[in-house]
Amino acid sequence: MMKKKLLFFLIIFFSITFNSFSIEPDIFVQSTVNRASKLLGEDITKDKKIEKLKLIAKETVDIRGIGFYTLGKKRKSLNEQEKKRYAELFEEYFLKSFSSRLAEYTNPEIDVQSKEKLNENYTIVNSILKATNERPEIKIDWRIYTKNPDNPLIRDLIIEGLSLARTQKEIGRAHV
């Protein structure tokens, strides 16, 4: 009887403990933005910034999910080996494209404004890229994949209403 009580207690304890480590999507976005902003402000070469941005992207972006979304219905006609090769090529392309564009920014200030839980798998986080003398204020919405609350991932950026994932899909369609 004592073993059952102990087992019950441990199950409850660990389920509460594990759930307490889940990260809220808005905090995840602000943390990711802060990491990237700090990196972009560092006095290191552009190549070093690009390499470090790639690491941040690998940790925070659902590159595989975006890649297969980009592929669309064509994904169903590929065998496992072709899917694996496509995922590798897409990741390489995505990281190079993403990091080289982002490395051009210096000290971007992004403030998270709000979040809207769409369902168990997705939350939209609303933010603003603050205006500077060189650019106006820009509205950025982040589609966060929250199926695993301990590891939220960025699935899309919607910049001033334009979905980067959808744009990528249209570009992909033109080349496939």
Question: PLM features: residue spans?
Answer:
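Positively charged n-region of N-terminal signal peptides that target proteins for export
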Residues: 1-5
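Early exported N-terminus immediately downstream of N-terminal targeting peptides
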Residues: 24-102
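Short beta-strand edge/turn micro-motifs at domain boundaries
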Residues: 137-166
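Boundary at the C-terminal end of the N-terminal hydrophobic targeting segment
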Residues: 20-22
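Conserved small/polar residues in nucleotide/adenosyl-binding loops
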Residues: 174-176
